[in-house]
Structure formats: structure tokens, C-alpha cells
Amino acid sequence: SSYVLSSKAFFGWKGIDKKPNQHGLSRKHLMEACHEALQRMQVDYLDLYYCHRPDKNVPMEEVVRTMNTLIQQGKILYWGTSEWSAAEIVEAHMVARELGLEGPAVEQPEYNMFNRNKIESDYLTIFKNIGMGTTIWSPLASGLLTGKYNDGIPEGSRLSLEGYEWLRNKALIGEKIEKVVQLGKLADELGVKLPVLSVAWCIKNPNVTTAILGATKESQLEETLKAIEFLPQLNEEVMSRIDEILGNKPHLPEH
């Protein structure tokens, strides 16, 4: 069997004894977090190591040099970013080029039917001129695109848990629920479940390398993986109907 092993660093230790260098992208934290990840997973190296957020308190050169030190030490093969802006990614590549070092190979952005701007607009110049992979997260919009929140928040669901108030405020907007209902009807018409349609829509984008799938049951994962088989059915007509329902297609950047 073959797999790609990744880890990420930024938020670090959350306890009351949290120290300044136990979070962020300082050289100290990136090096220590990588070492600890290797120990936890009992491996010699990571295929991919993410800077989980940008860090305004650390110079970009320090981040680039640290990630390349880890590459040279054989602890990671590639490094990436997560939730970085297009400008921050370009800056990292410019710094890396000036130093003769490796820039980030992949970005991990949120991407789904309700969150399209980064993949479909902001990053287009990067995809064209630099070339960069993406590992998207939340293809089901925190479960909204499963349809399970159409009639409220079920007990035991993620949005019902303490500490997820921010997600409820972000995800449950009446207009979105109306669109989810319409998308569900389209999925029924196409003979698939809404999560399958939603994930297939994401991975159809040629700039999406892979998608992070979350599931609480094995059956949910098995169902969602049917998106790969369904992908050929996402023709131009179906994609146009989805865009018509969503009404949020990003404007392409002008050059």
C-alpha cells in the first residue's frame, strides 16, 4: 500500500502553560513541532509539512529557510501552506527564489459550493505562473451540504456541540439552506446523494489535487467516495444548473 503522510504546525500547545514559542511559525516552533510529529507517528520523515496559518510576527525568510532546513535534514520532502492569501504564497515563492530554496508546493484552503473565491479566482495566477497543488478542506461546508441541517440542528451533530457557536453562525444562513434543498432535489434527479454531488463538484475543478473527507461512520465515507464514480456525469449542463442554484460564481481577475 502507498500513502502520503502530512502534518502541520501553527496553533501548538493550548494549555495554561503555553509559551510564546509553542505556537506560530517561528523556527523554534516549526522545528520542534516537526520532531514531535515524527515521534508520535513513529516515522523518519513527512511527505508534506504545512504552515497551518500565516504568521505576521515571523519574517517570511525565516519560515522559508526553516522549511528548507527540514527538507535538507530529510525530515520532510515538501512543505505547504494552509489558509494563506495569494499575496502571502507569492511572497514565499519570491523569497525562496531569491535564496535558491524550495517554495511551498501545496496550499490547503477551504473550498466548497459556498466558498469558492480562493480556488476559482484568487489563486488562478498562482496556478498558472507558479504551479501549486491544493488539498481542500470542508468540501461539505461543515456538513451543511449533506442536507442534515435542513430542518434544524440535530442533537449530537457537530453544530450542536459546545464550542461550535462560531460555526453555527457561519454555516446556518437561511439562504444557504434554501439552496441546499434545491441541490438535494438535483442530486435526487441525478440518482445520487447530495454529499456525493457536492464532493464530485469540488474535485472536478482541475486545480483541486485532493479533498479532505470527514466522517463519523465508515458507511458515510464509503458513500462519499462514490463521488469518484459519479464524476463523469458532471457535464456542462449539470454544472450550469448548479451555478444557477448557487448564484455565487466568482468573477475572474482581470489582467
Q: What residues fall within each predicted segment?
A:
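Short amphipathic alpha-helices and their capping/turn segments at secondary-structure boundaries
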Residues: 1, 33-39, 123-131
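A short, structured active-site edge motif that brings together acidic residues
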Residues: 1-14, 107-111
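N-terminal binding-site loop/beta-alpha segment at the start of enzyme catalytic domains
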Residues: 1-4, 44, 72
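N-terminal small/glycine-rich loop or linker at the start of catalytic domains
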Residues: 6-21, 45-50
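Active-site mouth loops of central-metabolism enzymes
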Residues: 16-31, 52-58
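Short, acidic/polar
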Residues: 24-41, 89-94
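Active-site groove signature of glycoside hydrolases
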Residues: 38-59
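Beta/alpha (TIM)-barrel catalytic core signal, keyed to glycine-rich beta->alpha loops juxtaposed to Asp/Glu
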Residues: 60-246
